[in-house]
Amino acid sequence: MLAATCNKIGSPSPSPSSLSDSSSSFGKGFHPWKRSSSSSSASCNVVGSSLSSFGVSGASRNGGSSSAAAAAAAAAAAAAALVSDSFSCGGSPGSSAFSLTSSSAAAAAAAAAAAASSSPFANDYSVFQAPGVSGGSGGGGGGGGGGSSAHSQDGSHQPVFISKVHTSVDGLQGIYPRVGMAHPYESWFKPSHPGLGAAGEVGSAGASSWWDVGAGWIDVQNPNSAAALPGSLHPAAGGLQTSLHSPLGGYNSDYSGLSHSAFSSGASSHLLSPAGQHLMDGFKPVLPGSYPDSAPSPLAGAGGSMLSAGPSAPLGGSPRSSARRYSGRATCDCPNCQEAERLGPAGASLRRKGLHSCHIPGCGKVYGKTSHLKAHLRWHTGERPFVCNWLFCGKRFTRSDELQRHLRTHTGEKRFACPVCNKRFMRSDHLSKHVKTHSGGGGGGGSAGSGSGGKKGSDTDSEHSAAGSPPCHSPELLQPPEPGHRNGLE
């Protein structure tokens, strides 16, 4: 469309018919032209400027389509060209100036019409071409006034256009607050508090930086900084650093009173050390009451272990303390311990003896250690938790010492040696029998018999777990068994 318009503008001699058509439509109030130097120059100047401005403003203010605007621009350009060619205006310098400026005015009119059809600023700025046309025609004889008006229009319209563009950009920035078009160095982050106003700048007065709070985010060095801490860290106090980097922003307004007492190093000493003392004091009355006599060993010198401390009273303790100690449950389930527990303080004599009897009817075995009584009860029940891990053996025993004795049969170790003849034995009871042969008059036969019998007895004891046998590391009876008691068990 613009190319067609330019072709029409560049035609050297338009047809007179177009002049008649255009003159009939545009020149209703014009009088017949006369060939005068000054008047024709001035009138040509007026006609050229009025035609160009009329064509553009009419196309823009009527709000027509782009084709109508282009047609109007083409008609105005043709009329201006015909006027300049038909009325040559003599040889005056104004005629050459008009003939040059008329074509430039037509081109400017066409460009302005094309811009007005698509620009949102057409209604306000329909005279974009006026400064160029008037300035060019100012070179003529009567174009001085046009030149002055061009300067005034140039000084008025161009700042208005720039301000219009800036206001539209500001409106876009209001819609999209993070697009810094008008102000590229303005911060994107706006204060969220409604009463801040323009206080949301990064360098707001009175607000310290977030890294200047202190060594720790709770640590406050002095009361002045503690008093300034809520104001400098509250989100409404100012700016970018409070909305992004403040870890205490939402809490200092509520807990500002704690900055002097709980968060200060001097005042927080009463929270740590006395609290620790109070907590430790809470355990002090419990420990002596629960374990009043835990320091001395009650069976030291009696040949017992710690397990027998249950039924026996402490040497330095009162009957009341011992009753409180054993009030929870009986340490042993044997009949003697149950009777001592039932009697309470009166059963202190039974506890002092430390006797643990088997509750199986008809057995009557008594042991000085609860571990020995438990091993004996396993012998009654048939429980054998100790298993030999020797290859292809897998024998099971009721006591751990029996298992160790059995392992020596696999290894062939003889730990016990006779001090007289240096003979070695696997079991201590065999050695004791052998020593008796040296002290008595039994001779070697008895020793050999005891040795062979000891060997056989070792196997049978390991197999049957006889509780009355007196080997080393095995539970010993308080009363030695009768000579035929072992054989009866076997």
Swiss-Prot record:
Main location as per UniProt: nucleus
Entry's family note: Belongs to the Sp1 C2H2-type zinc-finger protein family.
UniProt remark on domains: The 9aaTAD motif is a transactivation domain present in a large number of yeast and animal transcription factors.
Matches recorded under Pfam families: zf-C2H2
Gene Ontology molecular function: DNA-binding transcription factor activity, RNA polymerase II-specific; RNA polymerase II cis-regulatory region sequence-specific DNA binding; sequence-specific double-stranded DNA binding; zinc ion binding
GO cellular component terms, A-Z: chromatin; nucleus
GO terms of biological process kind: dorsal/ventral pattern formation; embryonic limb morphogenesis; proximal/distal pattern formation; regulation of transcription by RNA polymerase II
Compositionally biased tracts (Low complexity): 16-25, 36-47, 297-314
Keywords from the UniProt entry: DNA-binding, Metal-binding, Nucleus, Repeat, Transcription, Transcription regulation, Zinc, Zinc-finger
Residue ranges covered by zinc fingers (C2H2-type): 314-338, 344-368, 374-396
Name of the protein: Transcription factor Sp8
Motif (9aaTAD): 208-216
Cell compartments where the protein resides: Nucleus
Organism expressing this protein natively: Homo sapiens
Region (Disordered): 1-47, 136-156, 294-324, 431-490
Function: Transcription factor which plays a key role in limb development. Positively regulates FGF8 expression in the apical ectodermal ridge (AER) and contributes to limb outgrowth in embryos.
Top-level division of the source organism's lineage: Eukaryota
Biased composition (Gly residues): 136-148, 439-455
Cysteine disulfide partners in this protein: none
Claim: Zinc-finger is one of the keywords in the record: yes
